[in-house]
């Protein structure tokens, strides 16, 4: 990896290609050169200078690759925080639904106890303490009328 440095805004501005584009183009027409010039390109070729230039170019390309990698990964890192917040929100909602389930479970236990008490009271051996069916039904309807809004609100919160 290359050295750590701040992310550039425009990667193309720092490349060697851009520097080459800034130089004015020169056109040479064959046959218009000086006759004294030797056209052998291998005569002026310095292999050490070429290798040093290629190392610099390779290092520059590695830096550009690192910058592109960082710029491509940056949105993913931002999305990780959103995913974490979303999962925390789901955990909080799940915790709330567990509380609602506990409340509904306690209501069901209360209804079961009420039913057992009514049945025990109904089967009482003492005929003077008997309750008529109309009184029991009226009491159950009143209880249902009181608990229906509470249960519908709990169900609404559970499904929310």
Swiss-Prot record:
<protein>
    <recommendedName>
        <fullName>Bcl-2-interacting killer</fullName>
    </recommendedName>
</protein>
<dbReference type="GO" id="GO:0042981">
    <property type="term" value="P:regulation of apoptotic process"/>
</dbReference>
<keyword id="KW-0496">Mitochondrion</keyword>
<dbReference type="GO" id="GO:0008637">
    <property type="term" value="P:apoptotic mitochondrial changes"/>
</dbReference>
<dbReference type="GO" id="GO:0008584">
    <property type="term" value="P:male gonad development"/>
</dbReference>
<dbReference type="GO" id="GO:0031334">
    <property type="term" value="P:positive regulation of protein-containing complex assembly"/>
</dbReference>
<keyword id="KW-0812">Transmembrane</keyword>
<keyword id="KW-0832">Ubl conjugation</keyword>
<feature type="region of interest" description="Leucine-zipper">
    <location>
        <begin position="137"/>
        <end position="158"/>
    </location>
</feature>
<comment type="subunit">
    <text>Interacts with RHBDL4/RHBDD1. Interacts with BCL2L10/BCL-B.</text>
</comment>
<feature type="site" description="Cleavage; by RHBDL4/RHBDD1">
    <location>
        <begin position="153"/>
        <end position="154"/>
    </location>
</feature>
<keyword id="KW-0053">Apoptosis</keyword>
<dbReference type="GO" id="GO:0031966">
    <property type="term" value="C:mitochondrial membrane"/>
</dbReference>
<keyword id="KW-0472">Membrane</keyword>
<dbReference type="Pfam" id="PF12201">
    <property type="entry name" value="bcl-2I13"/>
</dbReference>
<dbReference type="InterPro" id="IPR024579">
    <property type="entry name" value="Bcl2-int_killer"/>
</dbReference>
<feature type="transmembrane region" description="Helical">
    <location>
        <begin position="136"/>
        <end position="156"/>
    </location>
</feature>
<dbReference type="GO" id="GO:0012505">
    <property type="term" value="C:endomembrane system"/>
</dbReference>
<dbReference type="GO" id="GO:0090200">
    <property type="term" value="P:positive regulation of release of cytochrome c from mitochondria"/>
</dbReference>
<dbReference type="InterPro" id="IPR020728">
    <property type="entry name" value="Bcl2_BH3_motif_CS"/>
</dbReference>
<feature type="short sequence motif" description="BH3">
    <location>
        <begin position="57"/>
        <end position="71"/>
    </location>
</feature>
<keyword id="KW-1133">Transmembrane helix</keyword>
<comment type="function">
    <text>Accelerates programmed cell death. Association to the apoptosis repressors Bcl-X(L), BHRF1, Bcl-2 or its adenovirus homolog E1B 19k protein suppresses this death-promoting activity. Does not interact with BAX.</text>
</comment>
<dbReference type="GO" id="GO:0097136">
    <property type="term" value="C:Bcl-2 family protein complex"/>
</dbReference>
<dbReference type="GO" id="GO:0006915">
    <property type="term" value="P:apoptotic process"/>
</dbReference>
């Amino acid at each position: 990896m290359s050295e750590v440095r701040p992310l550039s805004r425009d990667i193309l501005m720092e490349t060697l290609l851009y520097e080459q584009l800034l130089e004015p183009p020169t056109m040479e027409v064959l046959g218009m050169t000086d006759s004294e010039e030797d056209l052998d390109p291998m005569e002026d070729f310095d292999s050490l200078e070429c290798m040093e230039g290629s190392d610099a170019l390779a290092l520059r390309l590695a830096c550009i690759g690192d910058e592109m990698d960082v710029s491509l990964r940056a949105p993913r890192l931002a999305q990780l925080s959103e995913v974490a917040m979303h999962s925390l929100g789901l955990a909080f909602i799940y915790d709330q639904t567990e509380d609602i389930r506990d409340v509904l479970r306690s209501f069901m236990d209360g209804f079961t106890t009420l039913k057992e008490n009514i049945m025990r009271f109904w089967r009482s051996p003492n005929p003077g303490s008997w309750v008529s069916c109309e009184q029991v039904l009226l009491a159950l309807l009143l209880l249902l009328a009181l608990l229906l809004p509470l249960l519908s609100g709990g169900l609404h919160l559970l499904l929310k």
